A protein has these predicted regions:
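A short, conserved alpha-helix in the catalytic core of glycosyltransferases
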Residues: 1-47
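Residue-level recognition of hydrophobic positions within alpha-helical transmembrane segments
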Residues: 5, 19-22, 76, 103, ...
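Glycine-centered flexibility sites
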Residues: 12-13, 51, 129
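Flexible, glycine- and charge-enriched loops at secondary-structure boundaries
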Residues: 18-21, 66, 70-73, 120
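Residue-level detector of alpha-helical recognition elements and their boundaries
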Residues: 22-23, 61, 95, 145
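Generic recognition of well-ordered alpha-helical segments
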Residues: 27-30, 79, 83, 129
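Active-site-adjacent helix/loop segment of glycosyltransferases
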Residues: 37-115
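Terminal low-complexity segments of carbohydrate-biosynthetic enzymes
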Residues: 94-149
Length: 149
């Protein structure tokens, strides 16, 4: 993402309620609402330093990998609902997410029947993230909380 500091300040910076996922989407949506044009260059590439960005943590430990996947899953759904609620209103966000919630509940039941504990756990955490956002509670789950579930 490239923008100048003046534009960043006019838009109001990043929404500090969003910990992970949708922070750029939210910023661009607010910029558009203020009349700024948004351009996406698909050919642009960046190189991240080794393991510094949260999403590229280097680990070979299976438990750590699963916990990170669960953490990402929780924050993704929390942030997505928060974004929709913020920009389209609570009612439309609920309508949009109702089929998603039904699908999550279905998958929890499916993986419980199949005895796939890892996927059942992931979808339970995803449901928890969605419900937390629906209840207007902050994005507060971290790796320690994921480990304890």
């Amino acid at each position: 993402m490239l923008f100048n500091k003046h534009t960043f300040d006019i838009i109001g910076g990043f929404d500090e309620n969003i910990f992970l996922y949708f922070e750029e989407t939210d910023f661009c949506k607010r910029a558009q609402k203020k009349g700024y044009k948004i351009f996406q260059i698909n050919e642009a590439k960046t190189i991240h330093a080794k393991g510094i960005e949260f999403g590229v943590v280097q680990t070979k430990n299976f438990v750590e990998i699963e916990n990170l996947k669960n953490l990402y899953s929780w924050h993704f759904i929390w942030s997505k609902f928060y974004f929709y609620k913020k920009h389209y209103g609570y009612t439309l966000a609920i309508i949009y997410f109702l089929p998603i919630m039904i699908r999550i509940l279905y998958r929890i039941k499916l993986y419980k029947i199949k005895k796939n504990i890892l996927k059942e756990r992931r979808y339970k955490l995803r449901l928890n993230g969605l419900i937390t956002s629906i209840k207007n509670q902050p994005s507060s789950v971290n790796i320690k909380k994921i480990n304890n579930n």
